[in-house]
């Protein structure tokens, strides 16, 4: 799977970031897709950019999305769509009382548009990209909206309430839709020669990576209405710094650079995640 960065969030300085514009992907989508053939890639992740699509509440402009869909169909590319990739309309944050209703409205409008344009075709969506990361970024370290500190759990809870409601609305409109979660896959470890408390803290932090999908599947917070049926495919992101030592800010080096017995092979991380949910797994870029 290939991917084109589609984040549209407010950065730490309150300025809107639009990576589809910054990378010129929209202007070069024809050649971007043609270049995939060199690598035998025919599936890509894209994003609709919520902040662009819904500039007025409940009024949706999918004109750019339709152009992207048309180009994909012309070249035989399967798109996987992020509905929310870090960005929200200017009048919304995850903690706003209208957030869930607005997100459900967006999900329904997107599915209805797709069905009208391409009836009977397969649609794969990630409702909200990396809930684990964006709830930390916006809720704990003031990196984006709502610019909070010690609000990470509250932001995550609000995002997952909207996520679940959005999935239910989409599956009602299109029972054959595929829901692909996308979360970071990490390994959080204690320092060497650590105390038992350090080990417990690291273990708890490691398990926190699963909270979002646990909520989606109703293993946590069942009051939000999650269910295993709401998840079809497990998607993970994995980067060079996805294994770190708790409380230090230090990342483990790749195993082939400087072996550390605490390093966990990526294959083992994937196996652990699969055994937790027993869903097909996709590595997303």
Q: What are these regions, as identified by a protein language model?
A:
Residues 1-27, 33, 37-39, 53-285:
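Non-catalytic scaffold segments within catalytic domains of secreted glycoside hydrolases
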Residues 45-48:
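Active-site gating/metal-coordination segments in enzymes
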């Amino acid at each position: 799977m290939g991917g084109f960065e589609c984040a549209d969030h407010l950065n730490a300085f309150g300025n809107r970031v639009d990576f589809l514009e910054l990378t010129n992907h929209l202007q070069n989508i024809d050649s971007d897709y043609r270049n995939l053939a060199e690598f035998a890639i025919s599936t890509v992740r894209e994003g609709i950019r919520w902040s662009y699509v819904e500039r007025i509440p409940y009024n949706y402009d999918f004109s750019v999305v339709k152009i992207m869909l048309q180009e994909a169909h012309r070249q035989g590319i399967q798109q996987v769509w992020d509905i929310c990739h870090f960005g929200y309309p200017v009048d919304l944050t995850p903690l706003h009382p209208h957030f869930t209703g607005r997100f459900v409205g967006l999900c329904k409008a997107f599915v209805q548009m797709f069905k009208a344009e391409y009836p009977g075709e397969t649609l794969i969506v990630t409702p909200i990209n990396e809930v684990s990361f964006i709830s930390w970024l916006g809720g704990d370290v003031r990196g984006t909206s709502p610019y909070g500190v010690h609000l990470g759990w509250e932001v995550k809870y609000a995002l997952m309430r909207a996520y679940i409601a959005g999935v239910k609305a989409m599956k009602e409109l299109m029972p054959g839709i595929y829901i692909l979660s996308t979360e970071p896959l990490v390994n959080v470890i204690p320092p060497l020669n650590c105390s038992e408390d350090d080990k417990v803290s690291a273990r708890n932090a490691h398990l926190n990576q699963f909270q979002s999908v646990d909520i989606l599947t109703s293993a946590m917070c069942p009051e939000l209405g999650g269910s295993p049926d709401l998840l079809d495919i497990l998607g993970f992101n994995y980067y060079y710094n996805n294994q770190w030592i708790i409380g230090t800010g230090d990342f483990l080096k790749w195993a082939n650079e400087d072996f550390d017995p605490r390093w966990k092979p990526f294959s083992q991380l994937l196996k652990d995640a699969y055994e937790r949910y027993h869903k097909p797994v996709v590595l997303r870029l």
